[in-house]
Amino acid sequence: MTNIRKTHPLLKIVNHSLIDLPAPSNISTWWNFGSLLGLCLMIQILTGLFLAMHYTSDTATAFSSVTHICRDVNYGWLIRYLHANGASMFFICLYMHVGRGIYYGSYTYLETWNIGIILLFAVMATAFMGYVLPWGQMSFWGATVITNLLSAIPYIGTTLVEWIWGGFSVDKATLTRFFAFHFILPFIIAALVMIHLLFLHETGSNNPSGIPSDSDKIPFHPYYTIKDILGFLVLILLLMLLVLFSPDLLGDPDNYTPANPLNTPPHIKPEWYFLFAYAILRSIPNKLGGVLALVMSILILAVIPFLHMSKQRSMMFRPISQVLFWILVADLLTLTWIGGQPVEHPFIIIGQLASFLYFLLILVLMPVCSLIENKMLKW
């Protein structure tokens, strides 16, 4: 009799995705981040569900409902900080996952890559709206500043912003709709993840060498199930260390002050994982130009597959490209630092140079470097 996992319509899908999936024999820890993102999404949906049971999306009670969760609900503080810091872990894994894709040329799987970009935008939108919900000072002013950017769109801008706000400022209507969207989006993300995996399993995983590995495949279970579980344990350990020892390390103290439309905080800034994009936005003096640069800083990922000039897929055997890649990483860290600094000298010019270098590296230097490497190899 054939095993039920190979015949049952539902179990067959699970079997082909997690058990009998042929996987390259040489994929490194950089390939763990996909499953870690799945774990992060599950943690966020579960903790978010329990938070939603006690949260009220009303301007009068939102802040105090979060306080109530932390003070009065059984382990409410734990659920709240797991959710807040879980978002940080989510973005760490996301950026590592995208970085891995760029380094090893995984972007040549176009459908998988493009759905990944849509997923990135969806997760960023969800995180932004989630940050508004506690209705602290930074929640309110962050929402005001970021939604206001849409007013830079010619002709329809102002109307669009007022439509999103549900009034003439960020108020009760805005908070209610942000809560609704923040609740529904993770489930849309989960559906997109399924499509992401569907397209990935059409081609199979890439591997560090970038060479087709059809001749050397191993079953996903037990080799990569055990490897993923090790990753899960490390992620949970790091998350628990963060939550139990310094839960507010990555947060903003201003968000412990209830939202006040009459009092602007001295430095309005988003959560740390958006600072690089915020720095790019601020580096251009023109409003529309800044918004375009902000969108392009993420959307540029869609252009990367078409700028792949190398005869090799991966950067594993391309030392000059490797140097440029790590300069790009350093540049993004610089932008993250600048995004958290006030708008004054020397931070303005550093931010402008780092923003210029970011686009220059991706659009010009890396493709040109690939061509030079081809010449060096006489290809």
From Swiss-Prot:
It is found in: Mitochondrion inner membrane. Heme b b566 binds at residues 97, 196. One of its GO terms (biological process) is mitochondrial electron transport, ubiquinol to cytochrome c. Heme b b562 binds at residues 83, 182. This is Cytochrome b. Gene3D superfamilies: Cytochrome Bc1 Complex, Chain C. The cytochrome bc1 complex contains 11 subunits: 3 respiratory subunits (MT-CYB, CYC1 and UQCRFS1), 2 core proteins (UQCRC1 and UQCRC2) and 6 low-molecular weight proteins (UQCRH/QCR6, UQCRB/QCR7, UQCRQ/QCR8, UQCR10/QCR9, UQCR11/QCR10 and a cleavage product of UQCRFS1). This cytochrome bc1 complex then forms a dimer. The keyword Metal-binding applies. Binds 2 heme b groups non-covalently. Component of the ubiquinol-cytochrome c reductase complex (complex III or cytochrome b-c1 complex) that is part of the mitochondrial respiratory chain. The b-c1 complex mediates electron transfer from ubiquinol to cytochrome c. Contributes to the generation of a proton gradient across the mitochondrial membrane that is then used for ATP synthesis. Its cofactor is heme b. InterPro entries: Cyt_b/b6_C, Cyt_b/b6_C_sf, Cyt_b/b6_N, Cytb/b6-like_sf, Cytochrome_b, Cytochrome_b_C_euk/bac, Cytochrome_b_N_euk/bac, Di-haem_cyt_TM. The chain crosses the membrane at residues 33-53, 77-98, 113-133, 178-198, 226-246, 288-308, 320-340, 347-367. It comes from the Eukaryota. It is a multi-pass membrane protein. Keywords: Electron transport, Heme, Iron, Membrane, Metal-binding, Mitochondrion, Mitochondrion inner membrane, Respiratory chain, Transmembrane, Transmembrane helix, Transport, Ubiquinone. GO terms for cellular component: mitochondrial inner membrane; respiratory chain complex III. A ubiquinone binds at residue 201. Belongs to the cytochrome b family.
